[in-house]
Amino acid sequence: MYTRNNNICEEFENIIKDLTSNPTVQKMNQFKQHYNTSCYDHCLNVAFYSYIIAKKLGLNYKAVARGAMLHDLFLYDWRNSKKALKLRKFHAFIHPEIALENSLKLFYLTEKEKDIILKHMWPVTIKLPKYPESYIVTFTDKYST
């Protein structure tokens, strides 16, 4: 679980500050993602660990942190809501598109950030990530479930 305790955390927080302070992004706190973890906390964890990996590999850690923070911005309870009951079977396939659509309404995104959000469910979906940064978030997301 992400906890703030050093300079690397300060840099990470500055990269995603405009995202985490947004009221719509904050709404992810209302939805459970995995077990007792909120969607917000899950995205924050994926963003932090992906950021660390990308930074160590000399990749675009800013795009990684930002894309990962928004990768599950679908804003519904996929287990219990009426909408989710109809879509539960398809949630894994459709939520990346919903998250990208929601993100684009709020923020300017780079091509890498868009790819990270849209393709993070590979290999469940057939949308193959285009960038190494997208693979980092994809695998960190799987590890964080």
Regions flagged by a language model, labelled:
Residues 1-145:
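Metal-dependent phosphohydrolase cores
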